[in-house]
Structure formats: C-alpha cells, structure tokens
C-alpha cells in the first residue's frame, strides 16, 4: 500500500430533524391537544486512532465525509430517529488541524482514542413543548440545528522512540533490520528507502522500543532536495536520534565528515527543536575496514567534525546529556547489541525522570491550590 502521510478533507455533521406540529386525533377525542414530537439529532463525525491503519491514502481519494440528518419528529409525541455517527479510522500519530483557524483539533497518540471532528445538530422541539395554560393549541415548533462543517488537514507523524538519520546508503535500513523484525528494502543505490519504516526492538519480555528509519537526507534537504525532507517531521516525536555515518564509502571522493556536517546543517535549517534533540553518532560499515584502518578513519573523522565528547574506549560514566559514539557493522551485527543496550538504558532513565518531573509538578500545583484557599485567623479553612 502506498505510504501517504498528508491529506486534506472536509467533514460535515448531519442537521437535526425538525420538530413536529401535530394534534391528537382519535375517535372520541375530537379536540385533542398538541402531540408533535422532537426531531432526532444529526449524525456526528469522529476520528478514531487505529493501530492497524498505517497510511492516510484513503483520505487522498475521498475528500468529503457527510453524516446523515436526523429524522423529523412525529405525531403521538414520537421523537424522530437520530442519525448514525461516522467514524473515520486513522493511523496512530495523526495530527488533525482546522484549516480555517489553524487550531489543532486532535493529536491521536494511542490506539482506540476517539475525537469528535464535527458535532451533529440537535433535533428541533415539537410543538408539545409550547403548550401552556394560556395557549392550549400552539402551532409553532422549531427546526433542527445545523451540524458543524470543518475543513481539516491530516498529518501523520509516526510514533517512535528512536529515529535514524543519515545520508542515503549510510546503512540505516540494514541497522533497523539487524536489531528488529522490520524488513525494509535494502539495495546498493541511493534512496532505496522511500517512506518511513518502523521496527520494534525487543530487549526482553518487559522492555522494548520502537525505531524509525526515514529516507536518507542530502545537502539541500531543508529546501526540498531529495526525499528525506518530506519525512523529517516523522522524527519530531522521537526521544533520541541516531546519526548513522558510512565510514567506508565506495566512492573514495566522498568525505564522511563533510556528509555528516551537511546532515547536521540540514537538521538545524529544517527545525531548531529537532536539531536540539539528543543525538548519538553511529559510525557504520566497520566490516569493510581492517582494525587499523578503522581506527585511523575514526580519528580523522572525529577531528574533522569537531567531536569533543568521550570516545568509545574512554572510561567514562555517561549521563543523560552527553552525546555518545558507537562503532558498528550493521551487516555483521558487530557492536549493535551494545548500541541497543545503551539505548534501552537511556530511554528507561528518560521515562523515569519524566515521571518524577510530572509528579513534582502535580504536587506543586496541589500545594498552590491549597495555599489559595481562604483561611480564618486560626488557620482553619473557611467553608465555601
């Protein structure tokens, strides 16, 4: 199935049914009073996150979604039937934005999450509601309310813990294949990866994380060159970036350091927030070099890019803020287990710190609420 990560649609909820104007007419009841019922509600349009849906391709071909109107009210005080709602299945990670107001309507972040996109109109009142002591035979009823109509932008941003970035043919797809069950297309030509691939990296029964591989970047990507610029947004939800570098390019004229600096420059031009994310350096394709040459190229590369952080052989206790460097061969799996182990440690600690921060903020908010409560001279809260 073709991977589509953007679409524009229009959703229209149904109109409420009109209230009825009707009088009771039965044998032996010649002057029956009003008995017109209310109209039914119009159908609403909902979005639902579905983990089994992974593209917005359906919304490229069907642009308008219209719910049905509610049924009008009936005599004998019978209400009109309400119209059924429409539920639009969308991939987890879909961001929905109102095109008219630029307001974010919803961010679908978990399976089963439901959000109302357009609310159906209420049914009109039947004239039974207008009967009074001075007006025993009212003839007015109210029409149903109009349903909401919205023009929406759908934008899919895949949900992953770790994102891979690098030049085409840096070995990103080979890496995600080596550490997960993902099987992206791999070949010896640029832009083999044409859309994001996700792989679940399982550490044990209780620990796993999701890795995202996007098409390779080239110089000028921030201005639209190549394929990767369209998919950089898919890295915005990640907690960690792995910058994969081909340390042994087939073309001897290619300088890995220049390519790495070009990637960093494109990242900065595209989005400062994305540029500021934690980013580790992964030097790949060591299987193409002997040990001495690999060491020489690593030293030359680190000097050229101005790497001022610990080297793999340094005895150093990594903290959450320090970028890390790894030397691997995704093809032979050399060094990949250590990489996966450290990623898991980092993500586990990151989640723990975020949970502690959220708990502290919640406690501080509760204290502030208590302090704002009015008190008597004795310090006892005044009853509301």
Swiss-Prot record:
Record note on quaternary structure: Monomer.
Summary of the function given for this chain in its UniProt record: An essential GTPase which binds GTP, GDP and possibly (p)ppGpp with moderate affinity, with high nucleotide exchange rates and a fairly low GTP hydrolysis rate. Plays a role in control of the cell cycle, stress response, ribosome biogenesis and in those bacteria that undergo differentiation, in morphogenesis control.
EC number(s) stated in the UniProt entry for this protein: 3.6.5.-
InterPro entries reported for this sequence: G_OBG (IPR031167), GTP-bd (IPR006073), GTP-bd_Obg/CgtA (IPR014100), GTP1-OBG_CS (IPR006074), GTP1_OBG_dom (IPR006169), GTP1_OBG_dom_sf (IPR036726), OBG_GTPase (IPR045086), P-loop_NTPase (IPR027417)
Domain Obg: 1-159
Subcellular location per the Swiss-Prot or TrEMBL entry: Cytoplasm
Domain OBG-type G: 160-348
Region (Disordered): 20-46
Entry cofactors: Mg(2+)
Family: Belongs to the TRAFAC class OBG-HflX-like GTPase superfamily. OBG GTPase family.
Record-given protein name: GTPase Obg
Record PROSITE patterns: G_OBG (PS51710), GTP1_OBG (PS00905), OBG (PS51883)
CDD domains xref list: Obg
GO molecular function: GTP binding; GTPase activity; magnesium ion binding
Name of the encoding gene: obg
